[in-house]
Amino acid sequence: MNLAKKMFNAEFADVRPISGVVANLMMYTAAMDVGDRMMALSIAHGGHISHARANLGGTAGQIRGHKVQNWVFDDEEFNIDVDASIDKIRGLQEKGDEIKFLLFGGSVFPFPHPVKEFREIADEYGMIIGYDSAHVSGLIGAGRFQDPLREGADIMTLSTHKTLPGPQHGCVLAKEEYADAIKRAAFPGMMSNHHLHNVAGFAVALAEMLEFGKDYTAQILKNAKALAQSLHERGFHLIGEHKGFTESHTILVDITETPLKDGSKVEETLEDANIIINRNLLPWDKKRGRDYRTPGGIRLGTSETTRLGMKESEMDAIAEFITRVVMKEEDVKKVAADVAEFKKDYQKVHYAYDNETKAYAHLRFM
């Protein structure tokens, strides 16, 4: 707990949640009554399924019965439209559809969210502000993104295996006034066992981030910019080009004008070529008759490649591998073999206490 509080300069930390989704459930439980109304990003705008309404199978709606209203989104800026969203909140309040909770953060997160811009209206109506930092927590802790707890968030959740490179686990950070409610949400609310082996791994990851995190996250961001630029130069359409593509580890690519045309096909074909990315909805996909099965986008991240010691030149090589598969439609088996050969030079974990053990080795303790 002390390591988490130190890394994020938080008044309170609970390291018991066994995942980021469980951390979000703890946050909802501490901040709202069952059935209360909240604001969150839609999935097509980068929101996570744990933020979604019941008819989409979302955790907030199905498990807690929350009525989820979506932020008004600026597709061009790929971010929340502040003025339009404030107008929406006021309109809902005036109709009697009271908003209790404002949630920022998401699973597609190239640019910081406008947290501080909503603190005034949150205070006006007595709303609590939450922030799901699952994908960007390592960047936040190292001072490389935004600082939600200083910008107005009351509670911040995270998972521990993305830009914060630890085991699969979760954490809730908050102002001290929410500590008791969060602790009750953890136990007896959510868990009778919080997987102590992963808590130990989380502690090691936090200690490593406190020592190596600034260098690690700086390179993550350089690599994300480099990969985005290399793909752009090869003819890919990247979201946020006019804003420098990204300010996080995440890159979002519209692949509808490539020969493969949809994100599912790109995802499957790149996996056959030993390149792991994931398909992703774009804000305008629904208008074009697309859904999660055939989305118009793909999402890429640079956390793991950076952890393996890759830098900007390697991002250019990766962009070329992707181009050979998606644009040039070269033989996938040939590209897969070339990727495997390329990867042989990157088998050690960097920015860590142990730089000698192979990254994917099965450790033996006996």
Region locations from a protein language model:
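Conserved small-domain helix->loop->beta segment predominantly found in fold-type I
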Residues: L206, T217, L221-E267, I277-T294, ...
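Short acidic (Asp/Glu) and glycine-rich catalytic loops that position anionic groups and cofactors
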Residues: A179-R184, V199-M209, K243-I251, T294-T302, ...
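A common structural junction motif
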Residues: A273-I277, V326
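Active-site lining segments that contact anionic ligands and/or coordinate catalytic metals
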Residues: P167-H169, T246-T250, E267, D272-N274, ...
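PLP-dependent enzyme catalytic core of the Aspartate aminotransferase-like
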Residues: K222, G289-M366
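Residues in well-ordered beta-strands of folded domains
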Residues: Q69, L252, N278, G301, ...
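Conserved PLP-enzyme active-site core in the AAT-like
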Residues: L3-A13, I18-H237, I255, T302, ...
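N-terminal entrance/gating region of PLP-dependent enzymes' catalytic architecture
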Residues: M1-N2, K6, T357-A361
